[in-house]
Amino acid sequence: MYGRSVQDCAYTASIGMIAQGQNDFAANGRIWLGLLAPHDRGRGLGLGCECLRPIKMSAVEQKPSEQPAPTTVAPDTVSTPEPAVAAAADNATAAPAPSETPATPAAPAAPDASGAQDTPATAGADSEVPAPTETKELVETKEPAEKKEPAETKEAPVEKAPVDDKTPITQLWATAKATGHPEIWGVTLADPETHVPTRIILQKYLNANDADLDKAKDQLTKTLEWRAKTKPLELVKKAFSKTKFDGLGYVTKYVQDGSTEPEAKEVFTWNIYGGVKSIDETFGKLEEFLDWRVALMELALQELDLASATKLITAEYDPYKIFQVHDYKSISFLRQSPQVKSASAETIKVFAQNYPELLKEKFFVNVPAIMGFVYAFMKLFVAPKTIKKFHPMSNGGSLAVEFADSKVAALGEKLPANYGGKGAELEEQGKGPLLE
């Protein structure tokens, strides 16, 4: 009898799976395990000089009167580019030959001692100034031209540009475009380089798969295909049976006045499974139940309003998530129908695949304390980061105290009275899928 009761308890706890199937929940494939447990947070120009040296040597061997010739050549060497300098030097070397012929008549002046003494001095001065000095200037004028080389290195960054097209985000964007469906969670997808909401969504798929790009691509593709087929945004406009779903699900939003920070807004989804009047009616038609549950989630995403998000997320920082509360008051954990089991399994599959990284924390309230052993058993198999998001509580009235650290002032007090707050009842402050 006890063995049978434990099994029934485990089956019954799987109702929690219906509430929200996140990628986190898929860690162990059994979200029901998180229902029951104690609370746990947890980079020389030698040519010019060599060309001018023959000019200097010729000037010394010539007579003083012939020295102006090099002087005429030197300026040309300074003002001409490298090829012209070589030509000027060749012309200058040939010039002294004709100038030596008129120099012979001028020989009588040579015996003049003073003239002979002045000539070396003059020659020395002329040879020192034009040749060395002009040569140095030539070298200096060519140095700037060589400095053009660094300009070529500036093209390096341009060569790296194509690499940016291979980042995980841009590859996911290419995958999304190839799929054809343009929307996820109410956001019309656009270039993530300029569209923050799209970048947030693509980053969530990377985060959900621990940065494994191939897995993220696969999940993103399946989500887009599922949304194209299911049309979740249309389900929000669809009216469901009041007899089957009245009072079973609500969405509430709490915002800190005067703040536009994403942390200053909290969105909740509430699943009141204790309000189920007929298991056969509510869970009998699986497709209908899933449509209703998806509509509730899409309403919460509308309140989260990712389309207006302006703050990028990372693997560690992501304020765009939702609180979930599942209330099991008045539910018997010793009985479970095939319909509920089927609904639980399919809901987990659909939500884990199509709504990753949207769960902030999940509270299971009014769960019998006797089922705490299931939570202890679950810790052996579920990843710690997932366990930290599950908070089973036997008393729903103590839920309000869990939000003392929220950026929304006095958030706990805004909750309904039966959850420890001072706010209006869910029927008044919350909204759910359309009913008729």
Swiss-Prot record:
Its cofactor is heme b. The keyword Heme applies. GO terms for biological process: Golgi to plasma membrane protein transport; regulation of exocytosis. It is a peripheral membrane protein. PROSITE patterns: CRAL_TRIO. Keywords: Cytoplasm, Endoplasmic reticulum, Heme, Iron, Lipid transport, Membrane, Metal-binding, Microsome, Transport. Belongs to the SFH5 family. SUPFAM superfamilies: CRAL/TRIO domain, CRAL/TRIO N-terminal domain. PANTHER family: PHOSPHATIDYLINOSITOL TRANSFER PROTEIN SFH5. It catalyses: a 1,2-diacyl-sn-glycero-3-phospho-(1D-myo-inositol)(in) = a 1,2-diacyl-sn-glycero-3-phospho-(1D-myo-inositol)(out). Residues 87-113 have a biased composition (Low complexity). Residues 134-167 have a biased composition (Basic and acidic residues). The lineage of its organism: Eukaryota, Fungi, Dikarya, Ascomycota, Pezizomycotina. GO terms for cellular component: cortical endoplasmic reticulum; cytosol; endoplasmic reticulum membrane; plasma membrane. The gene is SFH5. Non-classical phosphatidylinositol (PtdIns) transfer protein (PITP), which exhibits PtdIns-binding/transfer activity in the absence of detectable PtdCho-binding/transfer activity. Regulates PtdIns(4,5)P2 homeostasis at the plasma membrane. Heme-binding protein that may play a role in organic oxidant-induced stress responses. It is found in: Cytoplasm; Endoplasmic reticulum membrane; Microsome membrane. Its main location: cytoplasm. Transmembrane segments: none annotated. The keyword DNA damage does not apply. Heme binds at Y273, R293, H326, Y328, K362. GO terms for molecular function: metal ion binding; phosphatidylinositol transfer activity. Residues 60-79, 87-168 are annotated as: Disordered. InterPro entries: CRAL-TRIO_dom, CRAL-TRIO_dom_sf, CRAL/TRIO_N_dom, CRAL/TRIO_N_dom_sf, Sfh5. Residues 248-427 form the CRAL-TRIO domain. This is Phosphatidylinositol transfer protein SFH5.
